[in-house]
């Protein structure tokens, strides 16, 4: 089965954007590679930030375990970022509990919508 390897993420400033995501996720931004500044996730997929004058915002969701959610969500709050329970800014200052897990939405410096979830949406809880 094919696996996703990388995603190109347009950014106003690739270094600022890569470092922002790395800081929130508690990982290290990778060294620049060509025109890209990658951030690697635990499953090996990289988000390759590239400078762009035209940033069309997208949505990126990260599946994390409960401990990672707690740590990343604490960093979101410590950074003073606005966060929401829903993708259209529903439930300001709240998280959601979809599918028996926890989820939260917030924006990166480019306006990309980032999401942390502890359960994949559509996966029914046991029992």
Features from the language model and the residues they span:
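Short glycine-enriched loop/turn motifs at secondary-structure junctions
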Residues: 1-3, 53-57, 97-98
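Residue-level detector of conserved, well-ordered beta-strand and adjacent loop positions
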Residues: 40, 50, 107, 117-118
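Core segments of cupin and vicinal oxygen chelate
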Residues: 2, 8-47, 51-53
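Short aromatic/hydrophobic contact patches that present stacked aromatics
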Residues: 6-8, 38, 59-61, 103-105
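Short, charged/polar surface micro-motifs in flexible loops or helix N-caps
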Residues: 44-46, 54-56, 65-70
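N-terminal beta-strand motif that seeds the catalytic metal site of vicinal oxygen chelate
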Residues: 1-15, 60, 120-127
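Vicinal oxygen chelate
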Residues: 62-109, 113, 120-125
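Hydrophobic pocket/interface hotspot
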Residues: 17, 21, 60, 76
């Amino acid at each position: 089965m094919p696996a996703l390897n990388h995603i190109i993420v347009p950014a106003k400033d690739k270094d600022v954007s890569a470092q922002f995501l790395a800081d929130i996720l508690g990982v290290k931004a990778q060294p620049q590679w060509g025109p890209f500044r990658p951030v690697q996730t635990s499953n090996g997929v990289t988000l390759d930030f590239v400078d762009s004058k035209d940033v069309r915002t997208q949505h990126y969701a990260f599946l994390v375990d409960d401990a990672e959610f707690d740590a990343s969500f604490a960093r979101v709050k410590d950074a003073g970022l606005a966060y929401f329970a829903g993708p259209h800014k529903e439930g300001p200052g709240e998280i959601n509990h979809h599918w028996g897990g926890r989820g939260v939405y917030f924006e990166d410096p480019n306006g990309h919508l980032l999401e942390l979830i502890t359960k994949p949406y559509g996966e029914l809880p046991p029992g």
